[in-house]
C-alpha cells in the first residue's frame, strides 16, 4: 500500500481536482489557456484552514492501514453499544419509577349547572329576508352518575319460574248446530260451512299432527252458572206497591241538549231525542199541539201512552247501567262477574230470588241503602228515559220556560239572587249572554196564520218560541255556567215501596229444582213477555213495563237422558267426543263446559294423580259465542266468523284464547293471587297437536281441534325494576384515552317498598314478560368490606371520544373526552336543557316538562376508586378490555398488579421506537424534560431512520435479542483477529 499524502500534497490534489472540474464546464478558453491556468494554480501558495485540517485527518484515517481502520471501527461500535445500553437502562429505570407513581382517583358523585349563551337568528315580522341575531340563555343541568352506572326503568316484570304445568283441550265445531240455533236458511248454511272449512283448513295447513299423553277427564260442571249468567246476569223484576204510571204526557228536561247538527259543539246522541217534539213552521189551518201531543209543548218532550200506562204493576229490565260505584268498568269482566254474583248471593232473601230492601236506593224503598243499585240522577233522563219514566218514584222538573214557577219577564231578576238589579247597572255586560233570561219565552197564544185562502200550508206560531238556536242553553244552565231563572219542581209519581227480584238467582234456583233446560226455556219466555226479548235491547233502554206477570214462571218438564262417564282413553280422529256429549244429554248450543283440573305428580297440595295432562271437551258455541239465535242469518255468520278467526289467530301465535277456558279453578287449586293469575294468563302458551274434520256435507261440517297448553307457574314476581346501563368513565392516563368501567355483578335493580335488591339473571326468555330460570340476589360494588369486590376494567378508545344517548325522560346521557357547553369532560353526566342547544355537534332538546333536578332511584353505595398510573398503557398494549384493579385494592396492591401486568406483556421487546414512545408517555406526568428527550429519540428512530433504511430497521428491532447475540460473537471474533495482526517484533521495512 502506498504511503498517504502529506498535508501540502493533499491540498494541492484537492485544488487541482476542483480546477479540473471547473474548467470542464468552461468553453471560452482554449486548451493552451486551460493548461496555463493549471500551471498557475500549481505554483500558488495555499494556507490550510481548520476545516482543511479536519478533512485531511479524516483522509489520513481512511488512507492508513487496515489494522488502524479496524481499531477505529471497534472503538466506534463499543461506544455505540455503551451509549445504547446506558440509554435503555435509564429508560427502564424511569419505566419502573413510572409504575410506582400513584394513579388518578375517580369519584363520580359530582353535580354541576351552567348557563351558556348562544346566538340565534330571529326573523322580524315585517321583514321576511332580514334575520337579526339575538342572544338566548340556555340552562344546562348536569347530574353525575354514581359508579358510572345509569338506572333506567325496566317496564317488563321479571318472573322467577317455579315450574311449568301442562293441560290439553279438545274443541269441537259443528256448523249444523250453529245453523239450527240461528235459524239459517239452506243457502246461508252452505256459506257457514264454507267459512268454517276455510278457516280450519288454513289452520290445519300450518299445523302438524302428533300425539301427546292424555289421561282421564275430570270435569267441573259450571254450566248452570255460565248459562244463567250469560242470559240473565243483569235482569231484574221490580214490583210496584200500587199501580200508577207517569202522571203527564210531557216531561220538562231542559238539562238535556236538543237534537240537530250544530257547528260549534256536537253532543253524543241522547235517547230522549226519540221523544222530542220538533218545531215545524208549516202546519194546516187550525192545527194545535194539544190535539197531537196532549200536554207536551213544542220544543219539549212527549211521553207516549205505552210508557205512562196506569195498569203497569211491574218493571222488567236487563241493564248494568243502574249499578252503584262498586261496579267498576276498569275491572275485568271476570272480576265484575265474581263481584256481582257475590253481591246477589249476599242480598238474596233466603233461598229465593227476591233481594233485600237495602239493595235498592232510598227513592225505591224507605229501607234502601243502595247496596246494589244507585240513585237515579238528573242527567239519567237524557240517555235512559225509560228507566226514569218506569222506575222513578218522584221527579224533579228542571225548567227554563217562561211562566213556570210564576217567573215571567217582569220578575225574572227575582228568580236568582245573582240576577238582582241585573239590568240596572253594567253588571249584565260582563256576564254570559244567556245570563238571567229564559230559554223559551211565552207568547199570548198558539195560532196559525193563513193567507190567500190557503188552508194546508199555513204559518204556525207556537205558544213558546222555538229554542233550536240555543240547543244547549239548558245544559249549560244546569252546569252553572251562568246565573239563570231555573224552575225546579218536585212531582210524586208513585209510592217508594218496591220489591225486586233477580232473574239470575231465579235461574240458579230453578235449575236445581227443574233442570237447567227447563229454567232457561221458562225464563227466556218470560223475558219475551212483551213480544221483544228485553236482553236484546240496548243496555240504556232495556226497561219495559208489565201488567200482572206470573213470576216465577211455570217451568215445563223436559226429560234428559243421562249415562255414566266413559273412563276409557279418548279415541283420536273419531266423533267419540261429540257422541259422548250427546249421550250426556247436552245440546251443542249449550254444552257443558267440562274443564280439566291440573294434577302434578310433584305437588301433593294439588289433586293426586299420575298424569300431568288432563283432557277436557269444550264446544265453540258455548265457550266464545253469544246467543246467535237472536241474530239474523248473515249477522250470525259474521259473528261466528269473527270468533273463529280470532281463535285461529291466537292459536297460530301460540297464545291462549281465555274465552275457551276458565281460569278460576286454576287459581283455586294453585292458590295464586289475582296478580299472579294475570301473569299466568299472559305467559301461557298453546300448541295445536291435531286438526281434523270429523264430518262433511254440502250444508254442514264439523271439526275437532286438539290443543296443548303450557302454563308457567311463577315463584316470585319482581315488578318495580331498574335496568343497568354501564356507562363507565373516561381516563386520560400516560398519553392514552381509556374507557374505565366497574364490572357490576347485577343487571337489574329491584326496589319494592324500601327494600333494594340487586339481581343477576340467568337463562331468561323475553315473551311479553322476562321469564327466568335463575334469579340471584347479589351485593353491589362499593368501598365497604361487606359489599361486593368488583373488578375494574379498562379499554383503549380513540380520541376524541363522544357518546351522546337520548333517554326516555327527555334528558341526554353524555360521556365525552372534550368539554362543550360547560359539560365536563371524562365524567358521565345526565344532561337536561330548558331550550334547544347544540353541543358536541348534536342538538339537545328540552324534555316535555321543566326538570330542575333529576333523581335516579335506587341509590347505590358510594364508590371512590384510585387506578394505576399506567392504566392507559396497559389497555393500549393489549388492545382489549382487561382487568386493571378491583374496588377494594389499596395502592400497594394496585402497583404490584400493574408491575405484574406490564412484565407479563414483555413490553421491552418488539418495536423499539414505539416502546420509547410508551416510556415517554409514561414519564411525561413525572419528568417532563426526560419525556421530551426520550420522545425525540423515539421519533428519530421511527421517522428519520425509517426514511433512511426503510421498514428494515423496524423489522430488525423485532429480532433484537438474536441480532445482539450474533453481534457479540462477531465482535469477539474480530477482536481476536485484530490481536493476531499486532506485530510481535519490528519489521525492517
Swiss-Prot record:
Annotated region (Involved in virion budding), positions in chain: 1-15
Post-translational modification: Envelope glycoproteins are synthesized as an inactive precursor that is processed by host furin or a furin-like protease to yield a functional hetero-oligomeric complex. The transmembrane protein and the surface protein are N-glycosylated.
Protein origin, superkingdom: Viruses
Residues modified by glycosylation: 109, 141, 183, 309, 351, 392, 411, 424, 490, 509, 528, 557, 783, 809, 834
Gene Ontology cellular-component annotations: host cell endoplasmic reticulum membrane; membrane; viral envelope; virion membrane
Region (Fusion peptide): 577-599
Annotated disulfide bonds: none
Positions of crosslink type Glycyl lysine isopeptide (Lys-Gly) (interchain with G-Cter in ubiquitin): 14-15, 34, 53
Positions bearing the site annotation: Cleavage: 126-127, 572-573
Entry's transmembrane regions: 66-88, 962-982
Keyword Glycosyltransferase recorded: no
InterPro entries, A to Z: Foamy_env
Keyword Transmembrane helix: yes
Residues exposed to the Lumenal side: 89-961
Domain remark in the UniProt entry: The ER retention signal plays an important role in establishing the intracellular site of budding.
The protein's assembly and partners: The mature envelope protein consists of a trimer of SU-TM heterodimers. The N-terminus of leader peptide specifically interacts with Gag protein. This specific interaction between Gag protein and Env glycoprotein may allow particle egress.
Misc. comment: Foamy viruses are distinct from other retroviruses in many respects. Their protease is active as an uncleaved Pro-Pol protein. Mature particles do not include the usual processed retroviral structural protein (MA, CA and NC), but instead contain two large Gag proteins. Their functional nucleic acid appears to be either RNA or dsDNA (up to 20% of extracellular particles), because they probably proceed either to an early (before integration) or late reverse transcription (after assembly). Foamy viruses have the ability to retrotranspose intracellularly with high efficiency.
Name recorded for this polypeptide: Envelope glycoprotein gp130
Source organism phylogeny: Viruses, Riboviria, Pararnavirae, Artverviricota, Revtraviricetes
Amino acid at each position: 500500500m502506498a504511503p498517504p499524502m502529506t498535508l501540502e500534497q493533499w491540498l494541492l490534489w484537492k485544488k487541482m481536482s476542483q480546477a479540473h472540474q471547473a474548467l470542464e464546464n468552461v468553453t471560452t478558453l482554449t486548451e493552451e489557456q486551460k493548461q496555463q491556468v493549471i500551471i498557475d494554480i500549481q505554483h500558488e501558495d495555499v494556507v490550510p484552514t481548520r476545516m482543511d485540517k479536519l478533512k485531511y485527518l479524516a483522509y489520513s484515517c481512511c488512507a492508513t492501514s487496515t489494522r488502524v481502520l479496524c481499531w477505529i471501527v471497534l472503538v466506534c461500535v463499543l461506544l455505540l453499544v455503551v451509549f445504547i445500553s446506558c440509554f435503555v437502562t435509564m429508560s427502564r429505570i424511569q419505566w419502573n419509577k413510572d409504575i410506582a407513581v400513584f394513579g388518578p382517583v375517580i369519584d363520580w358523585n359530582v353535580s354541576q349547572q351552567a348557563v351558556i349563551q348562544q346566538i340565534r337568528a330571529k326573523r322580524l315580522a315585517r321583514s321576511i329576508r332580514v334575520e337579526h341575531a339575538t342572544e338566548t340563555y340556555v340552562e344546562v343541568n348536569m347530574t353525575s352518575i354514581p359508579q358510572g352506572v345509569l338506572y333506567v326503568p325496566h317496564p317488563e316484570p321479571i318472573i322467577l319460574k317455579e315450574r311449568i304445568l301442562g293441560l290439553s283441550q279438545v274443541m269441537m265445531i259443528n256448523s249444523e248446530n250453529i245453523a239450527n240455533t240461528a235459524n239459517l236458511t239452506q243457502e246461508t248454511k252452505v256459506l257457514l260451512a264454507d267459512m268454517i272449512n276455510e278457516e280450519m283448513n288454513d289452520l290445519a295447513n300450518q299445523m302438524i299432527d302428533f300425539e301427546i299423553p292424555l289421561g282421564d277427564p275430570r270435569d267441573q260442571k259450571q254450566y248452570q252458572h255460565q248459562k244463567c249468567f250469560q242470559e240473565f246476569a243483569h235482569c231484574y223484576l221490580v214490583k210496584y206497591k200500587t199501580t200508577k204510571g207517569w202522571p203527564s204526557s210531557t216531561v220538562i228536561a231542559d238539562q238535556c241538549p236538543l237534537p240537530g247538527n250544530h257547528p260549534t259543539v256536537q253532543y253524543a246522541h241522547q235517547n230522549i231525542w226519540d221523544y222530542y217534539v220538533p218545531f215545524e213552521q208549516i202546519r194546516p189551518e187550525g192545527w194545535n199541539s194539544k190535539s197531537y201531543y196532549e200536554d207536551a209543548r213544542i220544543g219539549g218532550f212527549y211521553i207516549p201512552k205505552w210508557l205512562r200506562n196506569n195498569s203497569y204493576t211491574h218493571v222488567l229490565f236487563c241493564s248494568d247501567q243502574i249499578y252503584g260505584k262498586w261496579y267498576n268498568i276498569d275491572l275485568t269482566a271476570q272480576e265484575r262477574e265474581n263481584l256481582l254474583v257475590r253481591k246477589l248471593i249476599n242480598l238474596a232473601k233466603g233461598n229465593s230470588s227476591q233481594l233485600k230492601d237495602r239493595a235498592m236506593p232510598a227513592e225505591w224503598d224507605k229501607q234502601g241503602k243502595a247496596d246494589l243499585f244507585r240513585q237515579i240522577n238528573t242527567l239519567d233522563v237524557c240517555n235512559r228515559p225509560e228507566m226514569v219514566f218506569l222506575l222513578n218514584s218522584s221527579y224533579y222538573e228542571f225548567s227554563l220556560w217562561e211562566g213556570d214557577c210564576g217567573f215571567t219577564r217582569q220578575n225574572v231578576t227575582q228568580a236568582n239572587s245573582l240576577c238582582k238589579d241585573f239590568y240596572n247597572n253594567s253588571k249584565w255586560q260582563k256576564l254570559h249572554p244567556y245570563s238571567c233570561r229564559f230559554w223559551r219565552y211565552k207568547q199570548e197564544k198558539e195560532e196559525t196564520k193563513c193567507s190567500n185562502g190557503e188552508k194546508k200550508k199555513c204559518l204556525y206560531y207556537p205558544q213558546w218560541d222555538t229554542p233550536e238556536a240555543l240547543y244547549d242553553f239548558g245544559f249549560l244552565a244546569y252546569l252553572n255556567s251562568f246565573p239563570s231563572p231555573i224552575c225546579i219542581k218536585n212531582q210524586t209519581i208513585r209510592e217508594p215501596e218496591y220489591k225486586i227480584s233477580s232473574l239470575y238467582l231465579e235461574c240458579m234456583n230453578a235449575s236445581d229444582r227443574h233442570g237447567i233446560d227447563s229454567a232457561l226455556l221458562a225464563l227466556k219466555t218470560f223475558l219475551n213477555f212483551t213480544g221483544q226479548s228485553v236482553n236484546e235491547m240496548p243496555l240504556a233502554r232495556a226497561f219495559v213495563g208489565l201488567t200482572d206477570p206470573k213470576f216465577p214462571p211455570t217451568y215445563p218438564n223436559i226429560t234428559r237422558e243421562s249415562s255414566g262417564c266413559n273412563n276409557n282413553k279418548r279415541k283420536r280422529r273419531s266423533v267419540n267426543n261429540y257422541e259422548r256429549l250427546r249421550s250426556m244429554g247436552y245440546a251443542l248450543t249449550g254444552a257443558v263446559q267440562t274443564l280439566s283440573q291440573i294434577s302434578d305428580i310433584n305437588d301433593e297440595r294439588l289433586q293426586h294423580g299420575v298424569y300431568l295432562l288432563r283432557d277436557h271437551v269444550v264446544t265453540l258455541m258455548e265457550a266464545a259465542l253469544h246467543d246467535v239465535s237472536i241474530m239474523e242469518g248473515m249477522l250470525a255468520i259474521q259473528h261466528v266468523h269473527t270468533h273463529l278467526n280470532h281463535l285461529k289467530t291466537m292459536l297460530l301465535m301460540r297464545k291462549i284464547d281465555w274465552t275457551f277456558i276458565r281460569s278460576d279453578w286454576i287459581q283455586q287449586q294453585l292458590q295464586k293471587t289475582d296478580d299472579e293469575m294475570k301473569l299466568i294468563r299472559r305467559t301461557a302458551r298453546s300448541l295445536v297437536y291435531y286438526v281434523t274434520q270429523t264430518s262433511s256435507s254440502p250444508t254442514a261440517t264439523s271439526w275437532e281441534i286438539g290443543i296443548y297448553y303450557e302454563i308457567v307457574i311463577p315463584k316470585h314476581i319482581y315488578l318495580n325494576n331498574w335496568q343497568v346501563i354501564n356507562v363507565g368513565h373516561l381516563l386520560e392516563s400516560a398519553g392514552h384515552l381509556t374507557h374505565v368501567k366497574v364490572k357490576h355483578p347485577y343487571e337489574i335493580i329491584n326496589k319494592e317498598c324500601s327494600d333494594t335488591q340487586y339481581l343477576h339473571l340467568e337463562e331468561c326468555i323475553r315473551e311479553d314478560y322476562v321469564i327466568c330460570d335463575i334469579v340471584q340476589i347479589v351485593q353491589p360494588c362499593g368501598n365497604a368490606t361487606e359489599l361486593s369486590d368488583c373488578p375494574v376494567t379498562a379499554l383503549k378508545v380513540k380520541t376524541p371520544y363522544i357518546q351522546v344517548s337520548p333517554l326516555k325522560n327527555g334528558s341526554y346521557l353524555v360521556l365525552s373526552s372534550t368539554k362543550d357547553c360547560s359539560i365536563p369532560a371524562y365524567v358521565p353526566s345526565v344532561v337536561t336543557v330548558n331550550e334547544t342547544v347544540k353541543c358536541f355537534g348534536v342538538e339537545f332538546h328540552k324534555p316535555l316538562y321543566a326538570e330542575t333536578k333529576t333523581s335516579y332511584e335506587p341509590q347505590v353505595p358510594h364508590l371512590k376508586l384510585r387506578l394505576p398510573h399506567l392504566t392507559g398503557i396497559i389497555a393500549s398494549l393489549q388492545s382489549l378490555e382487561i382487568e386493571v384493579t378491583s374496588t377494594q385494592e389499596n395502592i400497594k396492591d394496585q402497583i404490584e398488579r400493574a408491575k405484574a401486568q406490564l412484565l407479563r406483556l414483555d413490553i421491552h421487546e418488539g418495536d423499539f421506537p414505539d416502546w420509547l414512545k410508551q416510556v415517554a408517555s409514561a414519564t411525561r406526568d413525572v419528568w417532563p424534560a426526560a419525556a421530551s428527550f426520550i420522545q425525540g429519540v423515539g421519533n428519530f428512530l421511527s421517522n428519520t431512520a425509517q426514511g433512511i433504511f426503510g421498514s428494515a430497521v423496524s423489522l430488525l428491532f423485532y429480532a433484537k435479542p438474536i441480532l445482539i447475540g450474533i453481534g457479540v460473537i462477531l465482535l469477539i471474533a474480530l477482536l481476536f483477529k485484530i490481536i493476531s495482526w499486532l506485530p510481535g517484533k519490528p519489521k525492517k521495512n
